[in-house]
Amino acid sequence: MPSDFFYTNVSMIGDYILYRGIKDGQPTQIREKYNPTLFLPSNEKTKYRTLDGKFVEPIKPGHVSDCREFVRKYDGVQGFQVYGNTDYVYQFIGEIFPKEVDYDFNKIKIATIDIETTCDGGFPQVSNPNEEVITITYCLDGKYFVFGLGEFDLPDEYEQYSFDNEEDLLRTFLELWNEDHPDIVTGWNIKFFDIPYLVNRMIRVLGEREVNLLSPWKKIRSKTVQKMNREHETFQIMGVSVLDYLDLYRTFTYVNQESYRLDHIANVELGDAKLSYDEFDSMAEFYKQDFQKFVEYNVKDVELIIRLEEKLKLIELSLALAYSAKVNFEDVFSQVRTWDQIIYHYLSEQNIVIPMKTGSKKDEQYAGAYVKDPIVGQHDWVVSFDLNSLYPHLIMQYNISPETKIDQDKDYMITPNGILEGSDRPKKALLKHKSKDYSIAANGTCYRRDVQGFLPALMEKMYEERSMYKKKMIECQKQKEKDPDNRELDYQIAKFNNFQLVRKIQLNSAYGAIGNQYFRYFDVDMAEAITLSGQLSIRWIQDSLNKFLNNALDSEDKDYIIASDTDSVYIRLGDLVDKVCKKKDDNSIVDFLDDSCEKIIEPFIEKEYDRLSRLMNAYTNKMVMGREVIANKGIWTAKKRYMLNVFDSEGVRFTEPKLKIMGIETSRSSTPAIVRKKLKEVIGLIMSTDEDTIIQFIDDFRDEFNQLDPEDISFPRSVSGMEKYEDSNTVYAKGTPIAVKGSLIYNRMIKDRGLSRKYKSIVEGDKVKFTYLKVPNPTNDHVIAFPNSLPKELDIHRFVDYDLQFDKSFLDPLKNILNVVGWNTEKVNTLESFFA
């Protein structure tokens, strides 16, 4: 079982560490002065070394303020280098927890909150909190507390408080919160609305001193952050981590949604939605006429968040990430901070001290990943191969690390093009560096081979740990089959799954940190060494496979590689199937291709990557490419825009083929949901039927489309540049993007028609929907946007241009596919049909 000693939050004020955690199974908090450790060069041999092997000795200048003054005093002084971690919170965590933090998720207090306010003076503004807070639903570890400015009645499992004035409501809520401070508070968009509005409103109603009771340390800090070109006020509640579930969802689900409103996400993930109040014309009418239902609406929002966590376990995942890196929970949103501390703690275990942060500038651009121009069209029997965790393995292969990088100018003779062409100058350059036993990256930078760098060693450690945790999880799952009532096994399965997922996320985020100018170890040469070596790897195997297949199939200079990108190649093997598998059914062909990949193509790929490794004198060969999908048909329309009819994916055979679609409008959150659904359906028909079936499908969907509401057929977009493009005379300036144009028109109409209190204006960064309009219409323009639904008071519905919407959202992207297949979207009269 987990340890009874771990932290939940570590903060700092002045010289004091503010520590909250669990000790002996019980919550504890400690406030104490902290004396950090720094390091200075030493002429003596000591147990501590720098990354470049110099001996250093520890020094304790005093408290935190003394250390800061010490670093400032000697900054830039010649011959006086100071080393160590000046993020003193993390230094403290590392001292208290030198080994892995063994935590118990069930002992961490998690609160979920949602507030509602009046909107008599318009929509509530964090910067000017004039509206009263009239309901708060607060759930702490499964127990609900509901506060309302009015009478209401909920079932017994909800502890409810009714008030006749806002001051008493806020004070009672604050007292309850203060009795048992949560470790984490979550909710939907609480970082930018619920928390800052509540804090600012409490300051206005109760006073600043009272508001500080939200913090177990009686300290709240205001912070202004930039988001979508707007400044937002947020608050740090010292000792309590604010994990906005909206941020967690955006960060860790890796799927773009057309809207990030709670209502939409709940529908996508849970098949549920917020409580509807369509029977009322406005939110103000809602709470004034049916306060009981209004409270239930507030409660439902909190219940949806809790159900989302039960399904997705994003808080559990974020805590596993935080404890793995020994950072605070909120730090999981920063790749740079997380990786900085992962490296710090890893090196500390080896008594290696880290350098000070320097103000790096990303002045120089560097090359990204390689994407081949695809062979546009339809292809039979497509097989794909992909490289396993490419960027982490490139770091391992070439031993890319700050302390292994050779201090010399990069060799501009060495490039992916030069290496692949095999010309003399790159060959001579490679031989020169190989003679010194350097590992050579594809951008001409070199790295030591006599010692493994800390970055590749750390990658290797994480990769091995992930494999270990996956095996442990599978072992527990097998035991669970034999002992289904064993609750301890449930805990172990969840724990090991989280641990392996954490390692996967960390490995995948490593390059993001390395390529960030604010990273302690940022080096543009190292970042480019990774990307260009990745380019070389994928182009090397692309060329090798083409030579191999041309030789095997007696063809000459035929390109069998339909497409390739960062870490994948897509091969057309229709010629091979025609040569070997005539008159065989699909399943027999899939068996043949599966066997050919495993016994012939994969061993060839392994041999070719070993050859590349020797050519570059790599530290080790880490390029492992495995077969991904086998599809009987594939269609490419452009770079990264394709669809495959997959029979087998990584050895999993499907009873019925499944579609894999990339880059087409079916996977774009900017396409209306109904259109995404129908495009996926029609692509399935393209794979399995004929042109006449497609034409009939188009006609049927057009009829259905024309009956839908504007909200269902409009294009989802984010708006950016509202202030830039606004014009007080003409509404919008020349060259305004269409979604911004529609938003500015909407705002002007809402204002002109006196609807500003009922409908919120669109602001910078909002998700909106826009639709084309027939002219003339009340807007005197051809477009309108709206936040969620199109207000009936604007009298716009009857002017929506359904024909243009259908063409632009559905027919145009479908034509891109049908054009490469050679099919039409409507019946075409021919001489034969005319005389029939």
Predicted regions, residues:
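DnaQ-like (DEDDh/DEDDy) 3′-5′ exonuclease domain used for proofreading
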Residues: 1-181, 299-300, 304-323, 330-371, ...
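Active-site-proximal helix-loop-helix substrate-binding element of RNase H-like nuclease domains
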Residues: 146-147, 156-160, 181, 195, ...
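Glycine- and acidic
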Residues: 155-160, 179-184, 286-293, 324, ...
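Active-site palm subdomain of RNA-directed nucleic acid polymerases
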Residues: 274, 538-566
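Common nucleic-acid-contacting/processivity interface regions adjacent to the catalytic cores
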Residues: 281-403, 408-409, 485-544, 563, ...
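Catalytic palm subdomain of template-directed nucleic-acid polymerases
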Residues: 569-601
